[in-house]
Amino acid sequence: VKVDADTVLISEHLFDRIIDRFSSEPSLEVLSIGLHDFYTDTIINGLQISRNTVRWDFSKNSIFTDIPILDPKSYVFDTAVLSPAGEHSPNPSIPQAFHYGVHRGIKSIQKIHSTTHWANMQKVWHHFLQTRDVRLGFAVLGAELVYAGTFNRKDQDYTNPRMGEVLCTYKGMDAKQLEREIRRLRFLHWGFLPDDLRRRVLRYKRGKLDQNWDQT
């Protein structure tokens, strides 16, 4: 069972029910259980459980570290029975939210598996506009700085100080200031285009041309 550091489980019986699920379905190799996500306020693909026969390819320097080598027929994404298994990042700090945005921004411009992450960042943007929670604003700002070319895939590492240095330049911004800065960045970097066209332009420019794609 892979429980990320920013995930809080909410059921004391969850592990027993997971064991029962795998015992009753011998062909099941990977079970992913939906989590309630603070950023999007939706259920996201989150808690991943793998049978001990599952293998991963660690030879590639991939943004998507959780994708195993398996037959898709042996994979289940549960959004109804055991979901929500927990809360994803229920109370992030501003640096955590900013890092989330940068990381998801990089994921959303990849050659593959990018569409869902792009859609989720648009949900975070709308969630911010509804709630005015500055943590959501800083998450969107992080992604927009990826789209602006400020950050690349090397900058998302927690050991790289550059993300913190850039964040300091926005220190103390309130929701109104964040919205203004985000809208400015969006306009300057193809935000005037229809959403899906902007995604494809950024995927090509920031992803492929700026060499932020996974090397396959």
Language model features: what each stretch is:
Residues 1, 15-18, 31:
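Long alpha-helical, hydrophobic tracts
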Residues 9-11, 58-59:
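Activation segment
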Residues 11-23:
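Short alpha-helix within the catalytic core of nucleotide-sugar-dependent glycosyltransferases
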Residues 30-46:
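Short beta-strand-to-loop element that shapes/binds the nucleotide-sugar donor at the catalytic cleft/hinge
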Residues 59-75, 85:
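Donor nucleotide-sugar recognition loop
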Residues 81-216:
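C-terminal catalytic/acceptor-binding lobe
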